[in-house]
Amino acid sequence: MVGPLLVPASGVGELVPLAGGTPVGVVVVARPGTPAADVSAALDATHGTALDVRGVEIGWQADWRSLPFADRPPVLEIPRGADRDRALADVRDGQQEGHAVQAKLRTGATPTWEWPDEHELARHITDVVQLGISTKLTGGLHHVVRGDHDGGPQHGLLDVLVAVDAAITDALAPDTDRLAEILAERDPAVLAAAVRTWDADRTDRVRRTLTAYGCCGVTDPITELAELDLVAGAA
């Protein structure tokens, strides 16, 4: 259930000696606006070490195909504003060209990024499904159910999964308002009951669309999923 370790480009140098000789799968992450040279330097620092780079996460830019590390599976953070639709369409084009590229939306607030409410997240999910692309979500998914935590609102992992399933099911007649209602649901019993109806095929199609989520402490959502008897208990 836990994928590669997400490492900021600025922190690769600190991780190398800690890894020792034990292979560690990592994804190098850089915030939008980080110079490509800094990302390249971080990747260069992993050469000959135990760090196995599985991909890079950067802000979307029109020339991402020409970046020196574009051969690494890239995850492109989608901006707000005028470039949003262009960026999502570009990810679709990249996937159709054979690139292992995905979109990313930041679901948690930062000093420079206002928290995306359920309507904004619903629009992202709708557009991703309509374009037929894969996405990951990062930041803010510390709990399985929508709620107020640490002084502010946070989206829930189960809410997101159920919303993605609904978007796929209703792909011929997309209803962003309905997805927003799902994303605002705060009753874990309602969400858990919905997920329990999924068979393997339905689960796989959700996972093909929502490939991953980034979280500071993965034990929180996993523990909460176990408490709802949706996964085996985590040690």
Segment roles from a protein language model:
Residues 1-235:
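Expand to "…catalyze enediolate/carbanion chemistry for C-C bond making/breaking, isomerization
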